[in-house]
């Protein structure tokens, strides 16, 4: 089988992750990160042939300068790779209800991404810049750009999962509903879990936990998403690095009316100053929380609230499994590495038959997958996610 090289772009509001991946075997030829956009220290780091390199992009540089650098400097060193590119895959955070699967980028698709900006105000504008710059930089691949949506996997949710108990007209006229996020990751680890369990995906019942700086839990029944913890935006659900997750909506009125905070200040508080950062008042880094759990009250407090919330979501999603749960799967930076989070969470779920195996749990870290429960226990797995591979495979499939 000949190689199918895909350039995968993930444009954030102040960063751009990129990789060239062979969609046939998952081999990564180049990967990198451009960050600190719009700041004096804007820079780019990349790995090629195992060697790491770094360069300044110039003060105030952003997506356009980063893509120029990728094309004219990094790929210029590898003309053979550049010549073999067959497609460009773009990660898109929010596709609204319009996109239920990955699609080739057209004017209509670009308009659909624009229409979803209110639900992803930081990410979707950055994705549109990435698409525009890619079309400019690779005119030969103009019809080979593919959009892969974080929300697409969750479009199989039934109405009872995605509707809020608000006036129905808010959904009909304004699209206010649950959309979820991290769908590409939840889909990937569901596929991988089916392989581990030697089951067809369409017979798989799992609860997948993508835990990183952002986190979400998804109920997967018969291979399809039936519920997920993130909502209209990625603010709902779990305790996250700097996001509050679930709270009583009336807290917002109290902050405004009694404490005189503006809507913008409340938005900043809930999205950038809450979560682990808010609970520790020190850091959003889960490693600090894990390392200091036994000795510092702030770390213990944050960890306990984090795991309590996570266990509640896993427990509630078992009600959606039609009486059969094949496994709970952990992934994402915290899910793959924070053994303490997994242990404290599963310890709360003894009623469901989970019994952690301490040695297995400690072994399944730093990129290693594996079972983390005892042989007599209900199954829990660690599966490192690979969203870039899904994006590359979808791009290759749709442009073949």
From Swiss-Prot:
It comes from the Bacteria. Substrate binds at residue 91. ATP binds at residues 17, 210-214, 285-287, 333-337. Keywords: ATP-binding, Cytoplasm, Kinase, Magnesium, Metal-binding, Nucleotide-binding, Transferase. It catalyses: acetate + ATP = acetyl phosphate + ADP. GO terms for cellular component: cytosol. The active site is at residue 150. The record marks 182, 243 as: Transition state stabilizer. The keyword Transferase applies. Homodimer. This is Acetate kinase. It comes from Yersinia pseudotuberculosis serotype O:1b (strain IP 31758).
């Amino acid at each position: 089988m000949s190689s199918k090289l895909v350039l995968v772009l993930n444009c954030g509001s102040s960063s751009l992750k990129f990789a060239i991946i062979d969609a046939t075997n998952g081999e990564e030829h180049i990967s990198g990160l451009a960050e600190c956009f719009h700041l004096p220290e804007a820079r780019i780091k990349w790995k090629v042939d195992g060697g790491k390199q770094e360069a300044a992009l110039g003060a105030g540089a952003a997506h356009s300068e980063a893509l120029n650098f990728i094309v004219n400097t990094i790929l210029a060193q590898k003309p053979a790779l550049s010549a073999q590119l067959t497609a460009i895959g773009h990660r898109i955070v929010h596709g609204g209800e319009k996109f239920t699967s990955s699609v080739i980028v057209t004017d209509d698709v670009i308009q659909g991404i624009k229409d979803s900006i209110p639900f992803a105000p930081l990410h979707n504008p950055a994705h549109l810049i990435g698409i525009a710059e890619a079309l400019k930089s690779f005119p030969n691949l103009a019809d080979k750009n593919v959009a892969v949506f974080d929300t697409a996997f969750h479009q199989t949710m039934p109405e009872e999962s995605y509707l809020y108990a608000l006036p129905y007209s808010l959904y009909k006229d304004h699209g206010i509903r649950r959309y979820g996020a991290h769908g590409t990751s939840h889909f990937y680890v569901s596929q991988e879990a089916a392989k581990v369990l030697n089951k067809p995906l369409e017979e798989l019942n799992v609860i997948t936990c993508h835990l990183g700086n952002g986190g979400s839990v998804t109920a997967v029944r018969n291979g399809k998403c039936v519920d997920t913890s993130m909502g209209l935006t990625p603010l709902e659900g779990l305790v996250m690095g700097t996001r509050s997750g679930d709270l009583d909506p009336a807290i917002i009125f109290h902050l405004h009316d009694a404490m005189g905070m503006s809507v913008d200040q409340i938005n900043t508080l809930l999205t950038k100053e809450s979560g682990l950062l808010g609970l520790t008042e020190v850091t959003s880094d889960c490693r600090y929380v894990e390392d200091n759990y036994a000795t510092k009250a702030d770390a213990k407090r944050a960890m306990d609230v984090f795991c309590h919330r996570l266990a509640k979501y896993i427990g509630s999603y078992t009600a959606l499994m039609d009486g059969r749960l094949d496994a709970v799967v952990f992934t994402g930076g915290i899910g793959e590495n924070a053994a303490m989070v997994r242990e404290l969470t599963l310890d709360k779920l003894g009623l469901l038959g989970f019994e952690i195996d301490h040695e297995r749990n400690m072994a399944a870290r730093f990129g290693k997958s594996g079972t983390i429960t005892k042989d007599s226990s209900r199954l829990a797995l660690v599966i490192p996610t690979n969203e870039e591979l899904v994006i590359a495979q979808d791009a290759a499939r749709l442009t073949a």
